[in-house]
Amino acid sequence: MPKKRSGGGLSPTQQAAKFLGVSVLAGAVLAGIALPAVGALGLAAKGSVESFDELPANMKTPPLSQRTTILDADGGKIATVYSRDRTVVPLKDVSPYMQKAIVAIEDSRFYQHGAVDLKGVLRALNKNARSGEVAQGASTLTQQYVKNVFVEEAGDDPTKVAQATQQTIGRKIRELKYAIQVEEELGKKKILENYLNITFFGQQAYGVEAAAQRYFSKSAKDLNVQEAALLAGIVQSPSRYDPVNDEAEATKRRNIVLQRMAEVGDISRAQAAEAMKAPLGLKVSKPKNGCITAVKGAGFFCDYVRQVFLTDPVFGKTKEERAKVWNQGGLTVRTTLDPQAQKSAQRSIKEHVYKSDEVATAATIVQPGTGKILAMGQSRPYGVDIKNGETTLNLSVNDDMGGGMGYQPGSTFKPIVAAAALEDGMPANKVYSSPYQMAYPSPVSACDGKRWVNDSGNPAKLENENSSEVGPYDMKEATAKSVNTYYVQMISDIGICPVTTMAKKMGVERADGDKMPQVPSIALGTQEVSPLTMANGYATFASRGMYCTPVAIESVSQRVGDRKKSLEVPKSTCSRAMSEKTADTINTLLKGVVEDGTGSKAGLGSRPSAGKTGTTDERYAAWFVGYTPNMAGAVWVGDPAHKRKMSGITIGGQSYGKVFGGEVPGPIWRVMMSGALEGKPVEQFNDVHIPDGINRDRDKNRDDDRGDEDDNDNGGFIGGLVGGNNNGGGGGEPLPAPSFSIPEGFFRGQDNGGGNGNGGRFG
């Protein structure tokens, strides 16, 4: 008796014997059924033992693509995403009626024949010959399973799908050989199980479990006889027998299956007759896929998780490898999203900014010391229906993660300047003259021994909120009131490099990925950043100087067949950005902003909090970024298109003459954080005593009627960088024109052979 080869295949003699029979049968199938114009020996004439033997001995079976479930930190479902809606189930969890129905209609002799059914071939050949067309196929269930494996392997590549389904001799040869292998290795029960899990049932449902849920909103194990017959009938032509779109045609097909089940003895004729009278009984669950299905307004966070998966090398070295894992699915992704914090964020957003408003808001909360993203939401809902205000642009994140180009943070950047100064040795009670108006200082030192020089010929002047805001000021008062001239004098004193270096240590970088330019205007928040960046940057203060990279994923498991395996996930990396003393000092300064400064409307009552307001040039955006020791959050309000100024505007049903960081974003932050922190421990800051730098009384009432700090109630730039009427001008008054021209490139700078900065150059 010939022996098997060491590789597990048959000997050449055995292969030749099998191939002889297979060739004749396949020739009959292909030539007489699939290609009636070709002679019955067409395949045999083109085939040979050698070509059959050249095929790989083992068929590679790719893991079946399945749905992926994204969970919040408590295990609650956020969304279900998939490339193919499929849930793999064992045969024991499939109704016996379903098992019998699919065998009866697709391959009634399944348990009697091998990989090829000779009787079936001859029967189909005879019927097709009499009808003159392809009326009946002869592929066994095993052969159909093999073909479906090739289709699954092709994925969404149309060329590969066409190759997997094309009616050619080569494909039939390959299909037949692998059918023989599958029969020998798996056995009938496993083949049936695999077939039921891989087959397409229409309506985006792959596999019997997804089909049962789609058409009947129940599990496959609970299907009754008429439901099973309907699903089994769909397989031959999912579009033709689609019960949702053609109930009559689907009913006819179902009844054919029931009749066939009675003919082979699976059910009695009486059962079949009764089942044929029953209505289809559809209870359709509409296909739901992707982050659009996310609950609690977490669609943007869901999309951020997807972006992390597709971009982080931990999930694969190449973009293609990562996409393959994601599209294969079967993943359970446990995220960092805190359901309480997310619910609170969305509630506050909905209360304060309507989705139909001319401007939008985005809010993000992170956990200091871990980098975990706890909440992420915005006023414009996730979706593709632009006419109804939906968008897929994530306003909270950087451009490379599905966001935009960012927004100028205004005076919320000033604490970073203060941190750099303190780290550089500046005392916390440092006093600057801080005049109401001053020329922009020049030169200012930059990195690598360079200097920024303003040689525009028309030096810009900057000014404070109003003419009564005149120094000297120390750091505490200047921070609480966000005095522009104080912070410009500060960066001019310490130089630009320590500030850009500190920003980088805190993870505060431009949303478009460009480097932070070496220009002194960064002290006033001119470089576009995202809310997630600012929230996580301020979390560095809350964690006493430790910066942690943001993370959204806690764990990932993947089901492959009957096994579950854990995947490695990105970890937050933490590093010290500043000393504890510096962080504690900043916390003390920013507590003053909330307690007795421009951010008083954002205060959390008895719970210690700190933060900073900010409003950008021309009021295109307003911010509040704040934190407690256990949560940090950022709220941005503005026009993503950078076209609508927030003067004379209605937001959330309320009219505003001019919008300030403490007036709209501040209350959003307060409500959001109050709900997110409810029930959480009340933690204290490590306060630092900061002695007064000036030993004289200040007129504390002179700015009682100010709307915001830095935010230049005269409609000027960057909290008073460019002046105008500042005597508490009414919101309905026209904005005055600047009293001087602005040097070209003042805010973003230029780079013409070394020139870079506020209309200046490096020397």
Locations of regions flagged by a protein language model:
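Soluble, non-transmembrane domains of envelope/secretory-pathway proteins that act on or interact
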Residues: 1-6, 440-462, 609-610, 614-763
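N-terminal type II signal-anchor transmembrane helix
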Residues: 1-69
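Extracytoplasmic/periplasmic proteins that interact with beta-lactams or build/remodel peptidoglycan
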Residues: 51, 57-67, 72, 136-144, ...
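Active-site SXXK
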Residues: 100-103, 107, 261, 345, ...
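Bacterial peptidoglycan biogenesis and beta-lactam-recognition machinery
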Residues: 106-117, 131-137, 182-188, 200-205, ...
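Conserved catalytic neighborhood of penicillin-recognizing serine enzymes
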Residues: 130-155, 289-293, 426-499, 561-592
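A penicillin-recognizing enzyme superfamily signal
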Residues: 335-355, 363-365, 376-378, 384-408, ...
